[in-house]
Amino acid sequence: MATSSFPLLSFQEFLTGSEVEKRAVAQKLYNAFHTYGWVYLQDFGISKEEIAEMFAMSKKYFERPLEAKVRDTLNDAETNQGYTPDGAEANGGTDHKEKCFNLSVNVLQALAMVMDLDMNYFSSALAKADPQLRLLYYMPIERSIIESAGHARIIPHTDFGLCTLLFQDNVGGLEVDPFHTGEFVPATPIEGTCVINVADLLQRLSNDRLRSTLHRVTSPPLEKVGSDGMLPARYSTAFFVHPSADVEIDPILRDGEAKKYESVNAGKWRTMNTAKNYANILGPDGVKV
């Protein structure tokens, strides 16, 4: 275990190893997602320097005047692109976005190997995908506000796509409830790792064998809190992986297994859930959700 929350796994042998080594890594990844829904991944093909460049770009963006960022305001549930006051999404450079996409395909192919699916199963499902790279900024705020009832930097939620790749700074505050018991444990930042979690569509597709679990962002460790009681600014970069809009997500069943979910259209699912997250944009039928 990397911390009290979920495992740390090297992805190197899946990328460069033999078939036996690939399958061993794939099984460990599957086991982590089956048990916890989360994993710390290291040796995944994106350098520390490239990640640092992304954070520098994010910091530069959020240092712009508010009026400049407001011009980028998100207002369309289908495109789901733009600035929102508590976070933003931006194209951080084709190279980084493509590397994140390639990593997500490799992660999903590893799962396909264990699930006895065609190795191109997820590649096909992502053929016309529009993943989202989000640069997230959490402003400094009084610790007393965050720790009062009903408050958090991000309230407990699950992600609604296939999976999410998350790169954290060293501030901390991400917490995970892997067993939905109400007991959140820290996903402590580990340098050189990418945190990956299962999202709702992958849970549906696997008929609950892979787990999409609650997570939130709250106060970082006490040593990160200033003497004035202020929480420092926090930056993270999230890459949300969604299937192509025309893909139908229908649970893959094992022999004798009861189907737990009805089929859903990936595009409509995404638009509906995006609209739920933002009060000022429209759902798939042109009305506010």
What are the residue ranges of the model-derived segments?
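C-terminal flanking tails of non-heme Fe-dependent oxygenases
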Residues: 1-92, 97, 101-103, 108-289
